């Protein structure tokens, strides 16, 4: 089964990101991961037909093009050694010139039936032994380097494959070892998983590895439902004209994201706020330090998105539920929703009203 790779030549028109109505939590989580991929991806859980796949594809269409080494299966960065394949890195060390081109940020769909070899890549052992060369067939992780790897119904994916994806997403590298032969290549991507909670949850150990967890539901307001239906009908009738009507807002958001990524390094969080973030994590009995780290990163990304260089209490309040709700221990006797519990503790520690 082949993966679907989104390219600039893609025939199917994509619904504009700025035209998507509602689902603010999901959209914010995706934008923050684009600004700082080290947040660690996002898990989107929600009902069927709530726009999960549409929003992810719309995000990719929104992103600016990137410069890559020509004819390189790993989308190697021409100047950053951490994002180069071994072959490109060796050429650079030898002082050889490399040709570059620009391309849309890749989006790779991971099919549910994918095998580990299809995901990680394979080594041709026979060719390696007879010809003495490392014959490597890149997998989906190679294609997703510097892009987005999207797994729909990730809660139905084999746990071992989810582990492989999360390991690569965290380290930025994929290592394939067969019969004493080892190949390593960059695999730095934003991992986006989506699923329907009715079809089962991820194991807590795996869920904790996702940076953020967005919950979305079916829109209930009749007026909003009518607006969504009408927008979709207009898009289906004339996609080109519909997309043109959102060109200005799309370009504005693309520019905002580019500026936010450049601004991110300048953003600072006061020590007192960092202590309070850790206090919230401690009082919620969050295991490990991932929650602290991700919350700090996400708050900085939000400040950068809104054009500021310092994190505010409001920034933390807007993202802390996204960063912590999936890290709480499940208590069968607990009646309060995990997101509400996070906001409750946040308001006590920070002395604010719950958002």
Swiss-Prot record:
Per the UniProt record, the source organism is: Nephroselmis olivacea (Green alga)
Its protein name is Magnesium-chelatase subunit ChlI
Write the gene name. Answer: chlI
Q: Which reaction does it catalyse?
A: protoporphyrin IX + Mg(2+) + ATP + H2O = Mg-protoporphyrin IX + ADP + phosphate + 3 H(+)
Q: What is its main location?
A: plastid
Q: Report the function annotation for this chain.
A: Involved in chlorophyll biosynthesis. Catalyzes the insertion of magnesium ion into protoporphyrin IX to yield Mg-protoporphyrin IX. The magnesium-chelatase is a complex of three subunits, CHLI, CHLD and CHLH. The reaction takes place in two steps, with an ATP-dependent activation followed by an ATP-dependent chelation step.
Q: Please tell me which top-level EC class this enzyme sits in.
A: ligase
The protein's matches in InterPro entries, at most eight in alphabetical order, are given as: AAA+_ATPase, CHLI-like, ChlI/MoxR_AAA_lid, Mg_chelatase_ATPase-isu, Mg_chelatse_chII-like_cat_dom, P-loop_NTPase
Q: Which residues bind ATP?
A: 46-53
State whether it acts alone or in a complex, and with which partners, per the record: The magnesium chelatase complex is a heterotrimer consisting of subunits CHLI, CHLD and CHLH.
Q: Name one GO molecular function term.
A: ATP hydrolysis activity
Activation and inhibition: Redox regulation; active in reducing conditions, inactive in oxidizing conditions. Thioredoxins f and m mediate the reversible reductive activation of oxidized CHLI.
Annotated Gene Ontology cellular component terms: chloroplast stroma
Q: Which UniProt keywords apply?
A: ATP-binding, Chlorophyll biosynthesis, Chloroplast, Disulfide bond, Ligase, Nucleotide-binding, Photosynthesis, Plastid
């Amino acid at each position: 089964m082949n993966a679907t790779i989104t390219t600039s030549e893609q025939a199917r028109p994509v619904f504009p990101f700025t035209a998507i109505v509602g689902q603010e939590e999901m959209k914010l989580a995706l934008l923050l991961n684009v600004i700082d991929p080290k947040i660690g991806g996002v898990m989107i859980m929600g009902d069927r037909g709530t726009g999960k796949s549409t929003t992810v594809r719309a995000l990719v269409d929104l992103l600016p093009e990137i410069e890559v080494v020509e004819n390189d299966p790993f989308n190697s960065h021409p100047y950053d050694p951490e994002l180069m394949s071994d072959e490109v890195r060796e050429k650079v060390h030898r002082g050889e010139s490399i040709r570059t081109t620009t391309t849309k940020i890749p989006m790779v769909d991971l099919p549910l039936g994918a095998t580990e070899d299809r995901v990680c890549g394979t080594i041709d052992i026979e060719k390696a032994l007879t010809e003495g060369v490392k014959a490597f067939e890149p997998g989906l992780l190679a294609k997703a380097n510097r892009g987005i790897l999207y797994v729909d119904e990730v809660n139905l994916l084999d746990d071992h494959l989810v582990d492989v994806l999360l390991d690569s997403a965290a380290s930025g590298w994929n290592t394939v070892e067969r019969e004493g032969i080892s190949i390593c290549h960059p695999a730095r991507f934003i991992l986006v998983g989506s699923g329907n909670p009715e079809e089962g949850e991820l194991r807590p150990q795996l869920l904790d590895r996702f940076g953020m967890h967005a919950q979305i539901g079916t829109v209930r307001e009749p007026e909003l439902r009518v607006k969504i239906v009408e927008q979709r009908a207009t898009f289906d009738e004339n996609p080109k004209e519909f997309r043109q009507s959102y060109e200005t807002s799309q370009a504005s958001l693309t520019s905002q994201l580019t500026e936010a990524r450049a601004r991110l390094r300048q953003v600072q969080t006061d020590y007192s706020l960092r202590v309070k973030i850790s206090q919230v994590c401690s009082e919620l009995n969050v295991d490990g330090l991932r929650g602290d780290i991700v919350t700090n990163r996400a708050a900085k990304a939000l400040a950068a998105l809104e054009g500021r260089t310092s994190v505010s209490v409001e920034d933390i309040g807007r993202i802390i539920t996204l960063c912590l709700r999936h890290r709480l221990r499940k208590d069968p006797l607990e009646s309060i929703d995990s997101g509400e519990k996070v906001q409750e503790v946040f308001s006590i520690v920070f002395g604010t009203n719950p958002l």
